Amino acid sequence: MIISAKFITSLVKFDENLSSNFSEVAFLGRSNVGKSSLINSLCKQKNLAKSSATPGKTQLINFFEVICKRNEEKFNINFIDLPGFGYAKVSKNLKEIWNQNLDEFLKLRTSIKLFIHLIDSRHTHLEIDVNLNDYLKRFLRPDQKILKVFTKCDKLNQSEKAKLKNEFKDSILVSNLNKFGLDSLEDIIINQTLGLDK
């Protein structure tokens, strides 16, 4: 279980050097899909990760040190909150630089053990999400895993939830509003970062 968390730093550039001795979990998704809210819910802190009301406004890479406990043993992992994509109103040139830097960051950062791909449960087949999933699969290492996490599932009825879970069997459905699915997600994060989830 996660017992505490704190903000470490924000990086403007993906190539800024921030070494890590801990396994890391990267949170990716479209702008306003609920990345910051999910991190806050997992860490049981209301304002740990700052969310923006303006889609695409958050352009920093935010690092959080998370202390977990399993079988009475404590260990550290890092959460990485990556900039949301899909709405950022920036110049084409700047967007290309971001994409190149992000590409290098994700491919070369060997400490990342789990990619959490957040998808709005009401919009499950957007091209931008399909492309992201295909992109991650191209360089995924044996010690890494991609986990689809469908957010805002409180907006769905039971039939819609069952249909979604049947289509994406290895996914997790969560709701920050009623805390649905958070315990299951926490277990996967801990097992994957410890190398137990094969």
UniProtKB/Swiss-Prot annotation:
Pfam families assigned to the protein according to its UniProt record, in alphabetical order: MMR_HSR1
The protein, known as: Probable GTP-binding protein EngB
Organism classification: Bacteria, Pseudomonadati, Campylobacterota, Epsilonproteobacteria, Campylobacterales
GO process terms (BP): division septum assembly
Positions annotated to bind Mg(2+): 36, 58
NCBIfam families named in the record: GTPase_YsxC (TIGR03598), small_GTP (TIGR00231)
Functional summary from the UniProt entry: Necessary for normal cell division and for the maintenance of normal septation.
Source organism: Campylobacter jejuni (strain RM1221)
InterPro entries: G_ENGB_dom (IPR030393), GTP-bd (IPR006073), GTP-bd_ribosome_bio_YsxC (IPR019987), P-loop_NTPase (IPR027417), Small_GTP-bd (IPR005225)
Domain EngB-type G, residue spans: 21-195
